[in-house]
């Protein structure tokens, strides 16, 4: 068993490549995806994701978070919906502070 290991089993995996989703497992060790497929072994944490979808973080290219980022720098509502990256200032106005 690896320390800091997480196995997500039986997930409906959408890998972001455009291929069909498939049922499989994802092994994460020390916060890094190490393997995707049918994985056996003992792991620190095992999550049975049967009936659930597992996908990479989504990118939201059109947001109006500019002012919100001044008080919520993590864009918390997006994280709660699977969005890990946002683009701001794409409406020709950005209220977010800009630093060198």
Which residues make up each language-model segment?
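N-terminal metal-binding scaffold of metallo-dependent hydrolase/deaminase domains
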Residues: 1-42
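Hydrophobic/aromatic beta-strand patches that form the interior of the parallel beta-sheet core
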Residues: 8, 45-47, 87
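Flexible loop/turn segments at secondary-structure boundaries
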Residues: 15, 66, 93-97
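Activation segment
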Residues: 17, 37, 67-69, 87
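Active-site metal-binding motif and surrounding structural segment of the metallo-beta-lactamase
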Residues: 40-57
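Di-metal (Zn2+ and/or Mg2+/Mn2+) metal-binding site signature of metallo-dependent hydrolases
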Residues: 53-77
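Divalent-metal coordination cores built from histidine and acidic residues
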Residues: 71-100
């Amino acid at each position: 068993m690896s320390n800091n290991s997480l196995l997500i089993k039986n997930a409906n995996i959408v890998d972001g490549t455009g291929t069909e989703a498939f049922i499989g497992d994802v092994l994460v060790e020390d916060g890094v995806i190490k393997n995707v497929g049918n994985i056996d072994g003992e792991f620190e944490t095992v999550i049975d994701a049967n009936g659930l979808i597992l996908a990479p973080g989504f990118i939201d290219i059109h947001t109006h978070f500019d002012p919100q980022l001044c008080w919520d720098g993590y864009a918390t509502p997006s994280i709660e919906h699977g969005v890990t990256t946002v683009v701001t200032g794409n409406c020709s106005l950005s209220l977010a502070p800009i630093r060198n």
